[in-house]
């Protein structure tokens, strides 16, 4: 599944994305974010992070720099003290 998702994202970047003007409000772009998230965390967790990112990518969100979190950042987020 991981390999298929990476191929799909790369296809989107090469064949579909150039047909439309740039609209992503974030850096890195949502497709680059998804590619990195899936490569780093695997298909399930990477897809979850990508979906969260895509839900934020809309005209009412200010956007900006939003990198893929490190694995240590993910652990801190789930800590309950």
UniProtKB/Swiss-Prot annotation:
Location in or out of the cell? Cell membrane
Principal localization reads membrane
Q: From which domain of life does this come?
A: Bacteria
Keyword entries, A-Z = Cell membrane, Membrane
Write down the membrane topology.
Answer: Peripheral membrane protein
Q: Which GO terms describe its cellular component?
A: plasma membrane
Q: Name one Pfam family in it.
A: YidD
Under the heading PANTHER family, the entry gives: MEMBRANE PROTEIN INSERTION EFFICIENCY FACTOR-RELATED
* Cited NCBIfam families: membrane protein insertion efficiency factor YidD
Role: Could be involved in insertion of integral membrane proteins into the membrane.
Give the family, as the similarity comment puts it: Belongs to the UPF0161 family.
* Name of the protein in its database record: Putative membrane protein insertion efficiency factor 1
Q: Provide the organism lineage as a comma list.
A: Bacteria, Bacillati, Bacillota, Bacilli, Bacillales
